[in-house]
Amino acid sequence: MAVNPLDFLKNMSGFKDNIDNFKKEISQIVVCGRAGSDVVVVEMNGEFVVKKVVIKEEFFSDLDNEALEHMIKSAFNDAISKVKEEIKSKTMGSIPFGI
């Protein structure tokens, strides 16, 4: 069966619109990665840009440097995982099979 080039171009235009909609949805995602019972909280958007890092002051004196570094790393990794999951949940039903 031959493919009509005009139909193909129409479909490509729709595909571009879908991509633009995905980008908009993804940019609106905001997640919080947490570590150490919320001692460290990292807020990140769907484009993996960190918007905020919060470290509870009352734990500074109780934590050594290595423990704090580990919690910060864990909170970042948690946020990254959550962004990936949000992107996956928003796009899986909308992307045509095989793409």
UniProtKB/Swiss-Prot annotation:
It comes from the Bacteria. It is found in: Cytoplasm, Nucleoid. GO terms for cellular component: bacterial nucleoid; cytoplasm. One of its GO terms (molecular function) is DNA binding. The keyword Cytoplasm applies. Keywords: Cytoplasm, DNA-binding. Pfam families: YbaB_DNA_bd. Its main location: cytoplasm. Homodimer. Belongs to the YbaB/EbfC family. Binds to DNA and alters its conformation. May be involved in regulation of gene expression, nucleoid organization and DNA protection. This is Nucleoid-associated protein EbfC. It comes from Borrelia turicatae (strain 91E135).
